Amino acid sequence: MVDIEAVRAKYREERDKRVQADGGRQYLSAQGEFAHYADDPHAKPIERAPVSDEVDVTIIGAGIGGLLLGARLREACAFDTIRLVDKAGDVGGTWYWNRFPGLRCDVESYVYMPLLEELGRLPSEKYATGAEIFEHCQAIARTYDLYDEALLQTSVTELSWDEDSSRWLVRTDRGDLVRSRFVAMAIGSLHRPKLPSIPGTEAFQGHSFHTSRWDFAYTGGDISGGLEKLGDKRVGIVGTGATAVQCIPHLAESAAHLYVFQRTPSTVSVRNNRPTDPGWAAGLEPGWQQRRMDNFHALTSGVDQDVDLVQDGWTEITSKLAAILPKSAADADPKDIGTAVELADFHKMEELRKRVDAIVHDKDTADALKPYYRLFCKRPCFHDGYLDTYNRPNVTLVDTQGRGVERLTPTSVVAGGREYPVDCLIFASGYESEFGVPYTNRTGFSIVGRDGIRLSEKWAEGARTFHGLQVNGFPNCFILSKAQSGLHVNVPYMLNEQSKHVAYILKAVQQRGRQVVEASATGEKEWVETILRLANRNLDFTESCTPGLFNNEGNPRNVAILNSSYGGGSVGFVNILKRWREADDLADLELREG
């Protein structure tokens, strides 16, 4: 019999160790004296003359979201010029920036990598490498002619709406002035690295870099490992999240000694990767990927399906939850359902903690690697070699008891009052969060709509949108983000749904012979009311979680509720968009001549 109160008490104890009053301020942006941590190590700077022209659509962001939107617009609309603008040296977004050793997707490749069927491609493994995903992004850009008009190594500095011409004026750090009928922002959330705010960081004299800007010139090797230049180096890595879980085994194989500085352990389940089966691939029928994506989306959202097409760690979690729920859940007391969910969560977490004991030999190290929180407080990890790494004699886990690193000296890391000399320090500290950093801060540029209103002013108290995609006062402008939209573990799935929806709207605008489309004030108001009505469903859960990305470092109530994702679940959100399109009346949108 599980003592649920004892479990809750243990989780609270571990959470309280880690809560800091300054919340998200315990991190630094890669700006000012730390700007070099965000430099592009993958491309040589290019020189070009400023561009001054007019295009149909400007998409800011050339990651998976921008590529999907460009592809869906090519399929649906008669646009001559679709322009991608990105500060990176190529398309790919997070898969351009992140090239650390061991990098793979943690969602099955066949549902994660979009447009496989359209391109006639299949990944080589169930969980593809970052290099393969990056190459697939490049293939999307080539297939849909998105390279031709692209402005890469270019950062937007301002978007402003010109009412007289019904055009957006797009200004960049290259001196460009682009007049665009429509603009869309597909900024993403994994492109602005953040650093832990550790005293002495600026004085550290060893080599250091962020995992999203991996320095292979220093480490040697490539994305597959083989970091031969670390053979005589003492290496420290700060962080044990999803990135660190993948690169730590490769660092351990190559470094003279590796120190892993841990605040909070991750859950690490079996990955069970394998090559793509040629026989299975040969039997795929038209529409296979959309069916597989829909199946995975439904199962991982708690919607029962006749068959599990993916059969991975994500869907296994869901099946265990379904097995413990009351059989007549529709008629059950919500409190009983909540308790059943909590028990299912506990049993899964116990299974993961026992896995640590079964693999890690040293008891103290094993105990430090055991996660004590609800499963989805942090993104679950899947890896078949991470835990074994701690059995190596050249690896030391420095568990900071939830407090983090104390300070850096010119030559060492200080944690728990002890000094650890290192030659190289790697920050696996993640990115500026969509949950804790205002959207207009993360874009890095100002957005000025009709009558001179700035998006930063309109969203001062939180986002205000229609379906998370359009904003009243900002005509012909679309935003792909998590705010007031659907949220799911398979991010490209939701980006694809958003992209199809935007493409539908713009095709309808073209078919109706109109030039301008804008969310109505009424439509925006009613959607905001919907967001507010559903926003607090998960607040108690997120508040109980260990500090991290999903709860603003333990302070979820300090995040504007208006920045929440749609509280009715991602399946519900996708169905709302689908029903809206099926009505074919463009409800709550205003169309007019330019």
UniProtKB/Swiss-Prot annotation:
InterPro entries, alphabetized: FAD-binding_Monooxygenases, FAD/NAD-bd_sf, Neo-PentlctneDsynPtlE
Domain of life: Bacteria
Annotated keywords: Antibiotic biosynthesis, FAD, Flavoprotein, Monooxygenase, NADP, Oxidoreductase
Pathway info: Antibiotic biosynthesis; neopentalenolactone biosynthesis
Enzyme class: oxidoreductase
Cofactor note: Binds 1 FAD per subunit.
CC cofactor: FAD
Site (Transition state stabilizer): 379
Disruption-associated phenotype: Cells lacking both ptlE and ptlD accumulate 1-deoxy-11-oxopentalenic acid.
Reaction(s) catalysed (UniProt annotation): 1-deoxy-11-oxopentalenate + NADPH + O2 + H(+) = neopentalenolactone D + NADP(+) + H2O
Family as reported in the entry's similarity comment: Belongs to the FAD-binding monooxygenase family.
Role of this protein: Catalyzes the flavin-dependent Baeyer-Villiger oxidation of 1-deoxy-11-oxopentalenic acid to neopentalenolactone D in the biosynthesis of neopentalenolactone antibiotic.
Extra remark beyond the main annotation: S.avermitilis does not produce pentalenolactone itself in vivo but instead a group of new metabolites that are neopentalenolactone derivatives.
The name this protein goes by in its record: Neopentalenolactone D synthase
Organism expressing this protein natively: Streptomyces avermitilis (strain ATCC 31267 / DSM 46492 / JCM 5070 / NBRC 14893 / NCIMB 12804 / NRRL 8165 / MA-4680)
